Amino acid sequence: MSKVYDWFEERLEIQAIADDITSKYVPPHVNIFYCLGGITLTCFLVQVATGFAMTFYYRPTVTEAFASVQYIMTEANFGWLIRSVHRWSASMMVLMMILHVFRVYLTGGFKKPRELTWVTGVVLAVLTASFGVTGYSLPRDQIGYWAVKIVTGVPDAIPVIGSPLVELLRGSASVGQSTLTRFYSLHTFVLPLVSAVFMLIHFLMIRKQGISGPL
């Protein structure tokens, strides 16, 4: 085993990387509220894992979506648990994200030189809300249908470009198969990928600049 480790150590300097991570200075004013961002990340990882598991059974069609969710909840092994954890961690992620934003704002963590860290955090907050909107429509039940119809209909009030925006979001004039396909693609591929990129940027900047000092 040591020979395998030595082989990787010689090429990648694993120990130096580990020492850099574990020896990072943590200011004495840091408390449990500074963990809210990490908890949000943990919820995101739980979302990815449970969401991936459900893709094996979920069918993104208007005729089969609701039935496939019922199958997950009643027939698939531990499906009820996986979907419940997905739902609970989604709510927890939103809550932790909101508390994290408040903590950063109240402690002045958005000030110079951390403006870009704040901007990426705001982008991540918008992405989190987008997860909620797109995921809400996937069961294709009455609540999800009308929620999506209302949300996608909001841009219709914008002069000139309102109607084209609505059609772009829905894929057609009304909420249907095109809408479900769009939201499923956004929820399972586009949003997770974009979120992962912004999270990486966010964490690299925090790593570079360190934790903000007390007020």
Curated annotation (Swiss-Prot):
Annotated heme b 1 binding sites: H100, H202
Domain of life of the native organism: Eukaryota
InterPro entries according to UniProt: Cyt_b/b6_N, Cyt_B6_PetB, Cytb/b6-like_sf, Cytochrome_b_N_euk/bac, Di-haem_cyt_TM
UniProt topology in membrane: Multi-pass membrane protein
Binding residue positions for heme c: C35
CC annotations in GO: chloroplast thylakoid membrane
Subunit structure as annotated in this protein's UniProt entry: The 4 large subunits of the cytochrome b6-f complex are cytochrome b6, subunit IV (17 kDa polypeptide, PetD), cytochrome f and the Rieske protein, while the 4 small subunits are PetG, PetL, PetM and PetN. The complex functions as a dimer.
Descriptive protein name: Cytochrome b6
Species per Swiss-Prot/TrEMBL record: Pelargonium hortorum
Gene transcribed to yield this protein: petB-A
